[in-house]
Amino acid sequence: MNPVLLTRRLRLSDFSASNLPDLAKMNADPDVMRYFPQKLNFEESAELLKRIMAHHQQNGYALFTLHLTESDVFVGWCGLMVVPFEAHFTPAVEIGWRLNKIFWGKGLATEAAEAVLRLGFLELGLSEIVSFTVELNQPSIRVMQKIGMQSEPKDAFDHPKLPTNHPLQRHILYRLTKSLWLKQRECSKTP
């Protein structure tokens, strides 16, 4: 499959049916899924894959598979999706990522997310991209901060797809506008 994006260490490609075994294995890992309501079984991962592919068909973008460029090993996914629920910040496009745990702590989520932001702002013409996670998910929050996203306490929200008082209900919202992203790129070039 032809890559959509290449980074220093990663190849980002559109999902296909052939990615289901790798996706299902990752989604069944309790460590990978610890900040989600549940692990996904094979059938649930197949449904997720169908939604990802349908989103791409409808919107022209979705989540991408991540593979190491040197070895073609499946790392996880990263990409953009329209937020599928109503909240104070919707309609919105969300950036997200999920990596197999053997790739945690290596900067790969940040590397992929930076490429996806560039695609979202420069190729797709998005004016703002959001990301959100549960308050306990510090690894994802660190990635959001590393890629320049910002959070306001007033933007915290209870995820509408989780029951009241669910331990993962409270979420932190991060945002990044195209203008701020461009400004950050300009500042990073200054000596």
Regions found by a protein language model. Give the residues of each.
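Conserved GNAT-fold acetyl-CoA-binding loop/helix
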Residues: 31-52, 62-64
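Short loop/turn motifs at secondary-structure junctions and domain boundaries
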Residues: 55-59
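Acyl-donor (CoA/ACP) binding surface of acyl/acetyltransferases
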Residues: 1-34, 67-191
